[in-house]
């Protein structure tokens, strides 16, 4: 194994001589992947970094999407600053998933906004200033409440280490206050109604790589924050507020799905579908069931494959050729871009949660856990499957069926680079849908420990 690591790093080092900026980023990613099974202590400052099965899937997802996001913009943007911003964002996200301290998590949670803000501000679309302001105001302001909660832990126990905080028993009233403070940051980051309006704006104005990493990884910080900051530390408050969170998630799923049906901007459609899927992830992780926890993690991974791929199609392949994102400009792709049409069909059915895709497994387990926790709200949320089928089939039927519109001149089908991106994201979606044991085995230890903690610490288990 050591020899394999040495060969990997040697190969990356040779590559870095050819492309210094990209090579540096690859060395950072490879170095972090090498130390996945290890723990790194910085005892002098009370910080250490490690990973478990839960963190591993987010770390590997980030490392997988990072080079793909660079390749996606290869023909459009060649600025070294652009690629360095992407690499910096990726490394910040990797460290965020590995840190074992609340304060460190918050710091990297906020620092991740900096490269994304600059990416959108410098390389975004026409309304990029508005989008950059949205992401700064919404996410930064809401996270101040999270900082207040973390500061409370520091004052009370003199430590913000995950394990140390989980051992402290706080009063129910204080737990409720801390729960609301931490949830304020998570709710915006997910995002849930009514603080969701920033995400479609940011996606519509963001460069392609920014949209890929935002949908694929950054939104997952909300699920990860619940696992690390809320469930192990605020058990009483979680039991009390889970019904409220379930109501908000159900409203988010139904509302955003209906809004998606009325959208005409293809990028906004994909953005709203991301909101709905992330709400399902929140339902699963708070279901107090092993099925729901596993389903939430699997769906997070599945969404990390499918959503960036859809953004590549609507914000990359089609937009690069025709410079339009409105659905009315496109029709009949099956006749003049058949390869792209096939990719779109596969990804649309994956986004719906069709059997034999990893999305199906994630949604099935998440909704099973949600229905077990709250039958009524879980069943209402299950309508997300029908609504997502409605808007995705609407998009697919419009784009692939019929004859070519006058707005779209005949052009070449997907290039080798574009097909490489599509195949790289479609293969894991289908592979893990057919053979999900690889994911389940990876997350099993972490999710099982989380479930054991839930059933031993939480006083209320079952239907709400």
Curated annotation (Swiss-Prot):
<dbReference type="GO" id="GO:0031966">
    <property type="term" value="C:mitochondrial membrane"/>
</dbReference>
<keyword id="KW-0472">Membrane</keyword>
<feature type="transmembrane region" description="Helical">
    <location>
        <begin position="102"/>
        <end position="122"/>
    </location>
</feature>
<keyword id="KW-1133">Transmembrane helix</keyword>
<feature type="transmembrane region" description="Helical">
    <location>
        <begin position="168"/>
        <end position="188"/>
    </location>
</feature>
<dbReference type="GO" id="GO:0048039">
    <property type="term" value="F:ubiquinone binding"/>
</dbReference>
<feature type="transmembrane region" description="Helical">
    <location>
        <begin position="420"/>
        <end position="440"/>
    </location>
</feature>
<keyword id="KW-0249">Electron transport</keyword>
<dbReference type="GO" id="GO:0009060">
    <property type="term" value="P:aerobic respiration"/>
</dbReference>
<comment type="similarity">
    <text>Belongs to the complex I subunit 4 family.</text>
</comment>
<dbReference type="GO" id="GO:0015990">
    <property type="term" value="P:electron transport coupled proton transport"/>
</dbReference>
<dbReference type="Pfam" id="PF00361">
    <property type="entry name" value="Proton_antipo_M"/>
</dbReference>
<keyword id="KW-0496">Mitochondrion</keyword>
<dbReference type="InterPro" id="IPR001750">
    <property type="entry name" value="ND/Mrp_TM"/>
</dbReference>
<feature type="transmembrane region" description="Helical">
    <location>
        <begin position="18"/>
        <end position="38"/>
    </location>
</feature>
<keyword id="KW-0520">NAD</keyword>
<feature type="transmembrane region" description="Helical">
    <location>
        <begin position="297"/>
        <end position="317"/>
    </location>
</feature>
<dbReference type="InterPro" id="IPR010227">
    <property type="entry name" value="NADH_Q_OxRdtase_chainM/4"/>
</dbReference>
<keyword id="KW-1278">Translocase</keyword>
<keyword id="KW-0679">Respiratory chain</keyword>
<dbReference type="GO" id="GO:0008137">
    <property type="term" value="F:NADH dehydrogenase (ubiquinone) activity"/>
</dbReference>
<feature type="transmembrane region" description="Helical">
    <location>
        <begin position="375"/>
        <end position="395"/>
    </location>
</feature>
<feature type="transmembrane region" description="Helical">
    <location>
        <begin position="207"/>
        <end position="227"/>
    </location>
</feature>
<comment type="function">
    <text>Core subunit of the mitochondrial membrane respiratory chain NADH dehydrogenase (Complex I) that is believed to belong to the minimal assembly required for catalysis. Complex I functions in the transfer of electrons from NADH to the respiratory chain. The immediate electron acceptor for the enzyme is believed to be ubiquinone.</text>
</comment>
<keyword id="KW-0813">Transport</keyword>
<feature type="transmembrane region" description="Helical">
    <location>
        <begin position="54"/>
        <end position="74"/>
    </location>
</feature>
<feature type="transmembrane region" description="Helical">
    <location>
        <begin position="239"/>
        <end position="259"/>
    </location>
</feature>
<dbReference type="InterPro" id="IPR003918">
    <property type="entry name" value="NADH_UbQ_OxRdtase"/>
</dbReference>
<feature type="transmembrane region" description="Helical">
    <location>
        <begin position="332"/>
        <end position="352"/>
    </location>
</feature>
<dbReference type="GO" id="GO:0045271">
    <property type="term" value="C:respiratory chain complex I"/>
</dbReference>
<protein>
    <recommendedName>
        <fullName>NADH-ubiquinone oxidoreductase chain 4</fullName>
        <ecNumber>7.1.1.2</ecNumber>
    </recommendedName>
</protein>
<keyword id="KW-0812">Transmembrane</keyword>
<keyword id="KW-0830">Ubiquinone</keyword>
<feature type="transmembrane region" description="Helical">
    <location>
        <begin position="79"/>
        <end position="99"/>
    </location>
</feature>
<feature type="transmembrane region" description="Helical">
    <location>
        <begin position="266"/>
        <end position="286"/>
    </location>
</feature>
<feature type="transmembrane region" description="Helical">
    <location>
        <begin position="131"/>
        <end position="151"/>
    </location>
</feature>
<dbReference type="GO" id="GO:0006120">
    <property type="term" value="P:mitochondrial electron transport, NADH to ubiquinone"/>
</dbReference>
């Amino acid at each position: 194994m050591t020899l394999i690591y040495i060969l990997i790093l040697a190969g990356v080092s040779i590559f870095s001589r050819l492309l210094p900026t990209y090579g540096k980023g690859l060395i950072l990613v490879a170095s972090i992947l090498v130390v996945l099974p290890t723990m790194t202590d910085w005892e002098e400052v009370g910080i250490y970094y490690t990973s478990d099965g839960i963190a591993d899937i987010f770390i590997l997802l980030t490392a997988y999407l990072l080079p793909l996001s660079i390749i996606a913009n290869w023909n459009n943007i060649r600025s070294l600053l652009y690629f360095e911003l992407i690499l910096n964002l990726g490394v910040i996200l990797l460290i965020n998933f590995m840190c074992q301290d609340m304060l460190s998590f918050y710091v990297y949670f906020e620092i991740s906004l900096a490269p994304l803000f600059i990416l959108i501000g410098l390389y975004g679309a026409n309304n990029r200033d508005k989008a950059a302001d949205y992401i700064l105001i919404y996410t930064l302001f809401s996270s101040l409440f999270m900082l207040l909660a973390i500061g409370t832990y520091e004052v009370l126990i003199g430590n913000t280490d995950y394990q140390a905080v989980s051992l402290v028993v706080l009063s129910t009233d204080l737990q409720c206050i801390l729960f609301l403070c931490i949830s304020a940051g998570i709710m915006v980051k997910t995002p849930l109604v009514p603080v969701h309006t920033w995400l479609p704006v940011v996606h519509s104005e963001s460069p392609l790589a920014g949209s890929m990493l935002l949908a694929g990884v950054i939104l997952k910080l909300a699920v990860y924050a619940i696992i690390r900051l809320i469930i192990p530390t605020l058990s009483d408050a979680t039991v009390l507020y889970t019904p409220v969170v379930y109501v908000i998630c159900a409203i988010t799923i139904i509302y955003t799905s209906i809004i998606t049906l009325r959208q005409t901007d293809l990028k906004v459609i994909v953005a709203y579908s991301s909101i709905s899927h992330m709400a399902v992830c929140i339902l699963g992780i708070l279901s107090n069931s092993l099925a729901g926890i596993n389903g939430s993690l699997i769906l997070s991974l599945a969404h990390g494959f499918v959503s960036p791929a859809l953004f590549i199609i609507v914000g990359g392949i089609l937009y690069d050729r025709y410079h339009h994102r409105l659905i009315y400009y496109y029709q009949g792709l099956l006749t003049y871009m058949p390869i792209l049409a096939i990719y779109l069909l596969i990804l649309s059915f994956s986004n719906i949660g069709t059997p034999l895709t990893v999305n199906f497994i994630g949604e099935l387990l998440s909704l099973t856990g949600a229905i077990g926790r709250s039958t009524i709200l879980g069943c209402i949320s299950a309508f997300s499957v029908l609504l997502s089928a409605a808007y995705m089939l609407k998009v697919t039927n419009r784009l692939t069926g019929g004859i070519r519109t006058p707005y779209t001149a005949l052009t070449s089908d997907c290039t080798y680079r574009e097909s490489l991106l599509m195949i790289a994201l479609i293969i894991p979606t289908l592979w893990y849908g057919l053979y999900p044991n690889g994911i389940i085995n990876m997350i099993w230890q972490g999710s099982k420990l989380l479930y054991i903690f839930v059933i031993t610490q939480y006083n209320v288990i079952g239907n709400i």
